[in-house]
Every structure is written in C-alpha cells, then in structure tokens.
Design a protein with these regions (language model features):
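Active-site-proximal, structured, solvent-exposed surfaces of multi-pass membrane proteins
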Residues: 2-5, 654-925
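Membrane-embedded helix bundles of polyisoprenyl
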Residues: 15, 111-123, 130-214, 226-247, ...
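Membrane-interface coil-to-helix junctions
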Residues: 19-113, 138-159, 249-253, 262-291, ...
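Transmembrane catalytic cores of multi-pass membrane glycosyltransferases
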Residues: 44-54, 60, 198-201, 217-303, ...
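Extracytoplasmic/lumenal acceptor-recognition loop(s) of multi-pass membrane glycoenzymes
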Residues: 68-76, 470-492, 507-576, 611-612, ...
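Membrane-interface micro-motifs in multi-pass membrane enzymes
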Residues: 75-80, 99-112, 132, 137-166, ...
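Transmembrane alpha-helical segments
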Residues: 113-121, 161-173, 205-210, 303-311, ...
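Contiguous transmembrane helix-bundle modules in multi-pass membrane proteins
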Residues: 175-179, 183, 195-197, 323-497, ...
Length: 925
C-alpha cells in the first residue's frame, strides 16, 4: 500500500483503538453495559446528569424557557440545547437510562477526540509516519486533562474542536478558505460560550506567538488579517448569544463568586496587609501548585524530551531556532499557569471553586505538536551510534516504568480515599509531600528516560521502545482513573444517588409545581429534584441570583457556595413556600409531619401538617419588609407573620432558667490519623417550655463551631452529608456544617422542662439564637386560610383569590423575575418583588383572577437573531476574503496594530501582573 493510503486509515484506526480500549476498561471494571460500574463521578453526578434530565424533560413537553423544578422557579433557556451533541444524544433515552447512557456517550466523545486529532495532525504534518500519527492522536485523546476531567462531558467537545481550529488557522495562513475556521469558532461561541473564551485567549496568545516568531515578516499582516476576518465573522454571528449569556450569568451568584483552594492562605496573608485590600487575594499568594494541575502534564514526558532535543539541535541549526523559541515560550507560559495561581485565575475570569486549569487540554495539544514536529522533521536525523544499546534501553525502560510502578498506587490510594477526587488534594502539606514531589520527580525521570532512548541508532527500535513505554504508561493510568468499578464503594454510592432519587420521584410523581418536596436530612444529592422530576427548594445550577439565594437564607434554608439546600428553615417558612411533603432516611417529628408510607422502602415519607395555600393574602406592609433589616430569621419571620394582621409573635426567644458552663480537653483526629488536642466548652441550659413549641437554634456569626448537642441527655443527630473516612472525626451532632448551616430544629415540646447541652469547639452560648415556634398559632393560621384554585401550564400560572379589601398583596411562592408579566381581572398590572425575591400582586377587593406568564421575547430573539447574524458573519468572511487583494494596505496595518495591542494586553494581564504580584507578595509575606 502507498504511504498516503495508510495514513488515511489512521482516521479510522485511532478512534477504533480508543473504542476498543475503553470497552476493555468497561469490561474488566464491570462498567455499563458490562455491569453496574459507572463513569459517573465528581461534576457529572451533581451537575451533568441533572442538567441532561432537565433538558430532556423540557424537550418532551416541558417549558423551554422556565424551570419550576427548584428554588421556586428560575428562567432557563434551553432552545439551543439540541445544538449540544451531549444533550441531543441523551434526549433519545428514557430518564432512568441517562446515568447508563453517559457511559456510552463517553466512548463516543473520546472517539471523536481521537478522530479530530488524527485528522488535524495528518494535515499539519504530512511527513509524519502513520505509527506516530496514530500515537500522538491517542496521546491527545488520553491526556491528563481528559482522564482527569472526563466527567465534564461538555468540555470534551471543546477538546475535540481545538485541534480543528488550529488546523483551520494554519490553512488560512496558507491562503486556504476561512469558512471552516469561521464555522468551528461560531459553533463554539454559540453553544459553549464560556469555554470558547479559553480558545479565543489561546488564539491571541499562542497563535500570536506563532505569527510573531515563526511567520515571515512580510506575511504577518496577511495572517493577522485572515485571523481577524474569521474571528470577526464568528463574533458577529454569535454576538447576541454572547450578550444573552453574559446578561444571564451576570445576574447569578456565580458571577464574581471567588472561593477556591487558597482561601485559608489568603486569610492569614491579609492579616498584615490591610493596605493591599484592593488587590484580589489570589494575586497575593506565592507559587501555588496541586496534583490536579500536575495531572495536566500526564504523558507529556516525551514532549518535554522532544523539546529539549529540539533546543539542543537548534543551537547547531539556525532554521530550527524559531520553532525552538516558539515551543519553549509557549511551554513556559503554560507552566506559569500551573504554578502561579493568579495566572490560572485570570484564565478563569477571576474565580473558581474547583477544576483548575480548565484549558489544560492546551498543554496536551502543545505536547502533541512538539512530538509531531520532532518526529516529522528531526527524528530521522537523530540517530547516534553508541554501542551497548541494550544497556541504554534497559536503563530507559527501568526509569520510565518506575514512574508507572511508583505513582499509580499512590494515585489509586488517594483517589479511593477522597470521594471528590483530585480537586481536594491540596488541603494538607502531607498531601503536597505525598503526591506532588513524587509526581514531579518521576516526571523528570521519564523525560530523562525518553532522551536516553534517543541514543539508540536504529530508528525503528527506538520508536518501538518509546511507543511500548507510552502504551504501558497511558493504558495503566487510563485504566486506573477512568470509571468506578462494579462493587466499588464509589460505584455503589453514585448508583444509590439515582436509585434513591427515582424512588422518591415515583412516590411524589403527581405533585404539581406548588407541592414541593423537602429533604431535611440531605440524604439525597442537592439536585435530586431534576432526577426525581419533582418540585423542591434544593438547587445547585449556578444560575440563581444572589438575591434569590439570600431570600432562601432569610427563610432559614442552608446555603453552600451557590447551592440552596433543603436543610434548615422552619415549619412556618416551609408552609409559606408550599413545602407540602418531606422525605428523610431518619424518622421525623410526628408533631410536624404525617407519615404516608409507614417506613416502606429506603425513605420515610411524610405529608407536612402545616401548609398555607397558594395565593395567600398579606396586608400591604409586606412590601416594606426586607430581610437585611432583621438580626435573624426568627425576627424576620415574626414580621412576616404580623402582615397577616396578627398583633402577637409567632416565634418567641427562649430565655434559660439556668446555665452551667465547664471547660475540657478533647482529642480530635485529623487527616492522616494524627491526634490533635483542643479545648472545648460545655454548656448546660435549662428551659421551661409553655404551650406547644418547636425549638430552633441558629448561630449569630460564622465563628461558632458546635461539636455536639444533647436534648435531655440524648444526643441530637443533625442533618448533614456522610462523613468522608479519614478526613475528620465529625460527630453526628456537629453544627453548623457545610450543608447544614442556618437553622437547626431541636424538637417539639409542650409544657415541660428541657435541658439543652451544647459542646462548643469555638464560640459560646451567647453566640446562639434559640427560639420557640408556637404551633397552636401556626395551626390556627393554616386553618383560617382557605385553598385557592390555581393551574400551571409550562410557564403560565392562573390563580383565583378572594380578598376583603383593596389594600392587600397576594403572595405567590415563585422567585421574582422581571420577565414575569401579570394581568389582574383582564388588565395588566405590575409584578411586585416582596420578601427579598418572591412575587407579589396588588389585589382588588373581591374576586381576583390572576394570570402570570413568563416572557419569552429575549429567548426567541436569540433564535431569530442567530439566522440572519449567521449569514451576515458568513458574508463578512466571504466578502473580505475575496476582496483581500484590493483592500488598502492601511487596513492591514491597522488590524495588525489592533492585534499587537490585544496580544500585549493579554500578556500583561494574564502573565506579567499575576507573576510579578506573586513574587512581590511572596517576598513581603
């Protein structure tokens, strides 16, 4: 066969090898379809699967514009979701099959990545042998970024498109069509807007370096013009989609939210640097590296070895120097992002909680380009006649295999111990020493080993030895890190999440949007409402506004990062928000809940005893109440209660009859099994409870840490997520915790004495709010309010309410959004924002027929604009491309100046400022 013909087969061979190897991993690990193992992990189980469920439901009869499922509703446009191949593929599966379908989807994704990589390298490196063409494609496919972040399935689309974008840019520079680049970038900007900006930045930085270093001076202006035309066309086409994306995300709590692994260091550092408060914390930290970032360099030992060999040869051969300079500078810039936290943060637009180096696939791409360039241009010249090749091969094999033998067990052990994966392997210096130093050292050994292999004179033997090592290295690591094996603790855990959600969904499948379910013991994952297809408060979509989150916090619900959590709240606030049903693995208070399944199944299911109707009527004082004006949720809820025309209080602050305090020393187990002694304060408080009350506790500040709570001598079990073995010795009664940090229910008592014993790790009794909710008053309120007729159709709500006067406000338990439009008895009226972030409508005396409809204008405009903008952008690319020769040279010069300015800004903002800041603050620390 001809060599060219063989190369074309690589487009099939590389994806085929990828599919076979992944199926082998699935088979030996018992992953679906070969067992109950799963690839679900990290982001996918809490974020990905629930999103796929929601989009599937929206396209199977739900609303494309509004989501009633969680957090009392939020706008959510999924009209363009089917342009996303993930969501399109999963739309054809039953809801209960989606957790299994993603296992198949991952194989497809990896095959697509290997195909696009092999296609791009085939076109970019024409002399590259079929063997190495296949090898670099597989190196890119199973790179550290992909096997670390494969659960973020959407990211793999960008990984697949990135080689094509670079190929299309190179073809533009060779005076080929600009349309492929325009189409690829337009698709990225429209469907994956956030991720596409990593690509835009990389084009400015790395393609800019290519233009300035490698391209001839007389061709630079033409290249910049071609790049500018293609990019401009893509930006024009996707302009409204970009505007809509940032318009939506700028209103969310995630926008500007900065909390990451450096928080503890930043707090310590800031203590002596008050004069630098205006500078972001991440610029004040010195070099910051963790195992997640280093994983981006997995398999790049050969690339670094090739870079060193290119530099050595460039010293003797002048034509190679510009390529050596380009690869070296690009590699150093990526190293800056790895070690300087500020650089990584700027690449992420200022914040992230986890998943550092979201553009880490660029390291793999640069590495593959290095390897391809080396074997395409240099390897044929690189034979060195040295005797005793067997010794050289043996030493290299031992060196490289040592990295596999020594580091894989470490990674497997820690990966098994830490359910969240690599993202938390930065919290302790023990982890730093245990993982990062060996990883770095063995990486260096691998580089040395591959360089030594170059001493083999026979080209085929040294290639075979190199490929053998790479095969063992990549297959071992990918097998270890992709998927959770059948019967493993993590596979059982993740499978149980969905089984539990499906069970709850079957029980409450008939609940409408105003019959919300609550999971106070957080035994279900945060996004269980999407999996179970039932309405609830619990939400983790990153799409809630801060005011929306604050409104739930004011009602007593817990909050973690951008999550709203079911734990916390009071019987009164739940009744207001129409929490009608409760599900828990623990048995709950019979005074508040009515059992409905008699403990059958994995959960105890209850009907809430205290439920207020939809469309409850307040007096107009409710419009003047703001949560921030009250010291705690109980005073705030008392004020809301008064807007029913009540002159007394629903919540009473409880004063203890006596308090006894004692100090003690307790041993606390910390990570690694070490014991640390800490001083604790134990408080006994005695109360005389009159009438029937539910006692609630909350903390006045964030400095309180309670080790345990006992009521009348019996330890109280507080709602929280399961403890992670080996990380902490958390008592089942600790409070507050990450996912239970607002209001804690202590129990219901009637005309009796109650002894509350609280053991503090931090803080004391004066830091607590302890209130009692009068159940007789709440019951009276619920009985005097009659139900109102209502109906919900997708994103439309009809409600009939009767009021006694014209100075009333109808409260509708839906989160406020200015896009809600309302008619009252056929006439347009304003939708009011009350109680922080909920909907109110000013009522008329008598019957009120209220009709709410969520406006789709902006969402529909997004679709309508996309089509004409596509042709406008395409026209710009075609017209300017064809007329390039007659365009005045001044335009080329102007565009070149603009590009140079953008390049300089990118270098200063992304690299120079954070690097200098890191060095300066490290010196003055």
């Amino acid at each position: 066969m001809k060599r060219g013909f063989d190369k074309k087969y690589i487009l099939i061979i590389a994806p085929l090898i990828t599919a076979i190897w992944l199926l082998a991993i699935y088979y030996f690990k018992g992953i679906y379809p070969f067992g109950t193992g799963t690839i679900i992990d990290c982001y996918l189980y809490q974020g990905g699967i629930p999103i796929y469920d929601y989009v599937r439901d929206a396209w199977h009869g739900g609303s494309l514009f509004y989501d009633f499922t969680t957090a009392c509703g939020a706008g959510r446009d999924v009209t363009l979701a089917l342009l996303d191949p993930n969501k399109l593929f999963l739309t054809f599966f039953r809801r209960d099959m989606i957790p299994n379908a993603v296992c198949i989807l991952l194989i497809i994704k990896f095959c697509v990545v290997s195909f696009t990589a092999s296609f791009s390298f085939l076109k970019l490196f024409e002399r590259l042998s079929p063997t190495w063409l296949c090898a670099v494609s597989l190196i890119y496919t199973f790179s550290g970024f992909n096997i670390e972040y494969f659960t973020n399935l959407d990211w793999l689309d960008v990984v697949a498109l990135y080689p094509l974008i670079l190929l299309f840019i190179k073809r533009m520079f060779d005076n080929k069509s600009k349309i492929p680049y325009y189409l690829a970038l337009t698709y990225l900007l429209t469907v994956f807007t956030y991720l596409s900006f990593f690509v835009i930045v990389s084009i400015i930085v790395f393609v800019g370096l290519y233009i300035f270093i490698i391209e001839d001076k007389n061709k630079r202006k033409e290249d910049i013009f071609s790049l500018g035309v293609g990019t401009l066309g893509a930006l024009v086409t996707s302009s409204y989609s970009i505007y809509r994306y940032y318009q939506l995300i700028s209103t969310t709590a995630r926008f500007g939210f900065t909390k990451s692994i450096f928080n503890n260091e930043a707090e310590v550092l800031n203590a002596g640097q008050e004069s630098f408060e205006f500078i972001p914390d991440y610029l004040k930290l010195g070099p910051q590296v963790n195992i997640v970032k280093l994983m981006m360099y997995f398999g790049m030992e050969l690339a670094v070895a090739c870079l060193i060999l290119i530099i050595i040869r460039a010293i003797r051969e002048k034509p190679l120097r510009k390529y050596a300079s380009f690869f070296t500078i690009s590699f150093l810039l990526l190293i800056c992002q790895t070690f300087i936290l500020g650089v990584d943060m700027f690449w992420h637009f200022g914040s992230y909680v986890m998943f550092p180096m979201r553009n880490g696939y660029m390291i793999a791409m640069l590495g593959c380009l290095l390897i391809s360039y080396y074997y395409n241009n240099i390897d044929c010249k690189d034979g060195i006649r040295i005797k005793n090749n067997i010794a050289k091969i043996t030493f290299a094999l031992v060196t490289c295999f040592a990295s596999v033998i020594l580091i894989v067990p470490r990674i497997k052990v820690f990966y098994k111990m830490i359910p969240a994966g690599f993202d938390v392997l930065t919290q302790e210096f023990t982890l730093l020493k245990s993982m990062i130093y060996p990883f770095s050292t063995l990486f260096l050994f691998g580089v040395i080993g591959f360089i030594i292999l170059k001493a083999i004179d026979n080209k085929h033997i040294r290639s075979l030895a190199t490929l053998t090592i790479l095969t063992v290295y990549f297959s071992t690591m990918s097998f270890a890190l992709i998927g959770n094996a059948e019967n493993s603790a993590k596979a059982k855990e993740y499978n149980s999440y969905y089984e539990n959600a499906f069970e709850v969904g079957n029980i409450y499948e008939k609940n409408d949007v105003f019959s919300r379910v609550n999971n106070p013991d957080v035994s279900l994952i945060t996004n269980y409402p999407y999996i179970a297809k039932i309405p609830s408060i619990s939400n983790w979509t990153y799409m809630l506004s801060q005011s929306q989150i604050d409104a739930f916090i004011a009602f007593g619900f817990s909050n973690a990062y951008t999550r709203v959590i079911d734990s916390g709240a009071t019987a009164f606030s739940k009744s207001l928000l129409r929490v009608t049903d409760t599900v828990s693995k623990d048995e709950l208070n019979d005074d508040l809940y009515l059992p409905i399944n008699n403990g059958q199944g994995n959960f105890n299911c209850y009907r809430n005893k205290y439920i207020l109707p939809v469309g409850i009527v307040f007096n107009n004082n409710i419009c003047n109440i703001a949560p921030k004006d009250y010291e705690n949720t109980f005073e705030y809820q008392n004020k809301i209660y008064s807007c029913f025309g009540k002159n007394d209080e629903l919540f009473e602050e409880l004063a203890p009859e006596s308090i006894n305090t004692s100090n003690d020393i307790k041993d606390i187990k910390i990570f690694g099994g070490n014991i640390e002694k800490t001083e604790i304060v134990r408080v006994n408080a005695n109360y005389e409870i009159s009438n029937k009350k539910v006692i609630y506790l909350s903390c006045k500040n964030k400095n309180v840490s309670i080790d345990n709570i006992a009521i009348n001598g019996e330890v109280l079990k507080t709602p929280n997520l399961p403890d992670y073995e080996g990380m902490t010795d958390r008592n089942v009664s600790s409070f507050p915790s990450v996912f239970n940090n607002n209001v804690l229910e202590l129990g219901t008592f009637e005309n009796c004495k109650v002894e509350i014993t609280i053991t503090f790790n931090k803080g004391d009794f004066s830091d607590l709010n302890i209130y009692g909710l009068n159940l007789e008053k709440l019951e009276e309120l619920c009985l005097e309010k009659s139900e109102n007729e209502y109906s919900v159709n997708k994103d439309k709500v009809c409600l009939n309410v009767t009021t006694d006067d014209s100075d009333s406000i109808v409260f509708i338990p839906i989160s406020y959004d200015e896009r809600w439009k309302c008619t009252l008895n056929g006439e347009k009226t304003d939708v009011l924002c009350i109680m922080g972030d909920f909907i109110g409508v000013k009522a008329q005396q008598g019957n009120n027929e209220i009709f709410l409809e969520y406006s789709h204008k902006e969402d529909i405009l997004n679709i309508v604009c996309l089509i004409p903008l596509f042709f406008i952008g395409l026209g710009i690319v075609i017209l300017l491309g064809k007329k390039q020769r007659i365009i005045p040279r001044s335009c080329f010069k102007l565009l070149s100046c603009v590009f140079v300015i953008l390049f300089c800004i990118a270098m200063i903002v992304l690299y120079i400022i954070p690097t200098l800041s890191s060095v300066i603050f490290a010196l003055i620390k």
